[in-house]
Amino acid sequence: MAVPFRRTGKTAKRKRRTHYKLSNPALVLCKETNAFTLSHRVTKNSGYYKGKLILENKPSKAQKTTDN
């Protein structure tokens, strides 16, 4: 089994780790609501994707109980 000849120093270890970082999410502006959303996903509030209605908005539970 191979054994390191020398111990890796703090500086070398930290320089190697500087490249592990989070990237900013790709946000796009929704044409219908003017809100930022993740790209390639349907907006939760309006249900639109690429300018087309994909999901119909369902009434919430509170609205269903008050309609009866």
UniProtKB/Swiss-Prot annotation:
Keyword ATP-binding applies: no
Gene Ontology terms: cellular component: large ribosomal subunit
Pfam (any one): Ribosomal_L32p
GO terms assigned for molecular function: structural constituent of ribosome
GO biological process annotation, one example: translation
Residues annotated as transmembrane: none
UniProt keyword Translocase, yes or no: no
UniProt xrefs under InterPro entries: Ribosomal_bL32 (IPR002677), Ribosomal_bL32_bact (IPR044957), Ribosomal_zn-bd (IPR011332)
Top-level taxon: Bacteria
Keywords associated with the record: Ribonucleoprotein, Ribosomal protein
HAMAP family: Ribosomal_bL32 (MF_00340)
Family to which the UniProt record says this protein belongs: Belongs to the bacterial ribosomal protein bL32 family.
Family matches, as NCBIfam families: rpmF_bact (TIGR01031)
Entry protein name: Large ribosomal subunit protein bL32
Lineage of the species this protein comes from: Bacteria, Bacillati, Mycoplasmatota, Mollicutes, Acholeplasmatales
